[in-house]
Amino acid sequence: ANPRQVRDMFRLLQSELGSGVTMTAHFHDTRGMGLANMEAALDAGIRSFDACLAGLGGCPWAPGATGNMVMEDGVFMAEAMGLRTGIDLDALCGIRELIETNLPDARLSGAIAKAGVPKGYAPATQFAVAAE
């Protein structure tokens, strides 16, 4: 899916189902669209997301597919946009290091792991985003 499709679909679902239904978005990052699709879902009002530490996983029906959207990257993006997740990004990155140590052959992904958290980064203090 691309961001326009995601935004349109969630807006349609919300108009049909009403505001009493909580929806969760589930994106893979196989073609680099995970964070862009998350932003589109946020724009459509979605506040709950599936994600996976270090992007672990994949899809048995799609050879070469990556795992779910990288949790560390999603948390960083949400917090950088002013959305409070309640997740300690430093602790999350520490858990990722444990995964790297204990699963040396695992195919891991994620921009925050490669580039690090920018200097001066501070977690958001505004709206809450549900962490699943």
Regions found by a protein language model. Name each.
Residues 1-132:
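Catalytic cores and adjacent flexible loops of soluble metabolic enzymes
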